[in-house]
UniProtKB/Swiss-Prot annotation:
Database matches in Pfam families: Pyr4-TMTC (PF25129)
Taxonomic lineage of the native organism: Eukaryota, Fungi, Dikarya, Ascomycota, Pezizomycotina
Pathway(s) annotated for this protein in UniProt: Secondary metabolite biosynthesis; terpenoid biosynthesis
The species this protein was found in: Gibberella zeae (strain ATCC MYA-4620 / CBS 123657 / FGSC 9075 / NRRL 31084 / PH-1) (Wheat head blight fungus)
Single biological process term from Gene Ontology: terpenoid biosynthetic process
One MF annotation (Gene Ontology) recorded for this entry: lyase activity
UniProt EC number: 4.2.3.-
Biotechnology: Diterpenoid pyrones display various biological activities and FDDP E shows anti-HIV activity. FDDP D and FDDP E show also inhibitory activity of 42-mer-amyloid beta aggregation that is involved in the pathogenesis of Alzheimer's disease.
Free-text function comment from the UniProt entry: Terpene cyclase; part of the gene cluster that mediates the biosynthesis of diterpenoid pyrones. The first step of the pathway is the synthesis of the alpha-pyrone moiety by the polyketide synthase dpfgA via condensation of one acetyl-CoA starter unit with 3 malonyl-CoA units and 2 methylations. The alpha-pyrone is then combined with geranylgeranyl pyrophosphate (GGPP) formed by the GGPP synthase dpfgD through the action of the prenyltransferase dpfgC to yield a linear alpha-pyrone diterpenoid.
Topology relative to the membrane: Multi-pass membrane protein
Protein's cellular compartments: Membrane
Keywords: Lyase, Membrane, Transmembrane, Transmembrane helix
Name of the protein: Terpene cyclase dpfgB
Length: 242
């Protein structure tokens, strides 16, 4: 869903619209690849790849803008419902394997189904409330930024708290990072050539969001390298003891 009607775009933006559209296509490829990769990795490692809160928030966003505020064009609806179907697969692997990661917390372990239901419902109510407040076109963009930050924070915290790399890989990290990063050039083009409807993209809050996203997701790759190295060192030490 576009924040502004493309038919209202000024001529100078239409000249570079193909670049923005290419960025959007690459975003779709990156995230589709990431969803498929997460499903495969989760089934293979018998765990879940995306942090639970981030997953519930993202899944609630998909539900909100597929069922309550569906995308306008046929192409947008197809792309969005395809993403929703893949996200259902990601959610399935999380529901199936979450108990394997919460043995240290009996309270969470015993209430995982309830936690999933409450979190998805709660986040969905927030997305709907924001859409009612500022309008669905603007809300879907703003709430997507919130989903991205929660995903970045949750993924990094999950990696550090687990202390292992099951459910994680450089491929998953890069496809997610690339899929979100490629939208930054699109936003720059919109702010430069179509500023009247995209003024917020030059705001301090948006600039802060981009910087925090780069910091968190960039740190994830570094932390994953350290975790992998620790796992290798531990495996070598264990073999020497034998």
């Amino acid at each position: 869903m576009e924040v502004a009607d493309p038919s209202r775009a000024p001529p100078e933006y239409k000249d570079v619209a193909w670049i923005a559209d290419t960025c959007k296509l690459l975003m779709g490829i990156g995230w589709t690849t990431n969803y498929v990769g997460m499903i495969y990795k989760s089934l293979k490692d018998e765990t879940y790849a995306m942090a639970l809160m981030a997953l519930c928030c993202n899944f609630a966003w998909e539900l909100t803008y597929a069922l309550i505020y569906p995308f306008g064009s046929d192409l947008e609806m197809y792309v969005h419902f395809s993403g929703l179907m893949l996200n259902c697969g990601v959610m399935y692997t999380a529901v199936k394997n979450a108990h394997r990661e919460w043995g240290h917390s009996p309270l969470v372990l015993r209430n995982l189904p309830l936690i999933f239901i409450i979190c998805v419902s709660g986040f969905m109510s927030g997305h709907v409330a924001l859409a009612a407040q500022v309008g669905p076109s603007l809300a879907q963009a703003w709430s997507a930024y919130g989903c991205q930050l929660l995903l970045s924070v949750g993924g990094l915290c999950q990696l550090l708290c687990r202390g292992h790399s099951r459910g994680a890989s450089y491929f998953l990290w890069f496809s997610r990072f690339f899929g979100s990063l490629v939208l930054v050039p699109q936003d720059i083009l919109r702010y430069k050539y179509w500023r009247v409807d995209h003024e917020y993209m030059g705001s301090p809050l948006y600039i802060w969001f981009v910087c925090i996203f780069l910091l968190l997701d960039g740190s994830y790759g570094i932390c994953l390298w350290y975790v992998r190295r620790f796992e290798r060192q531990t495996a070598v030490a264990h073999k020497k003891k034998k």
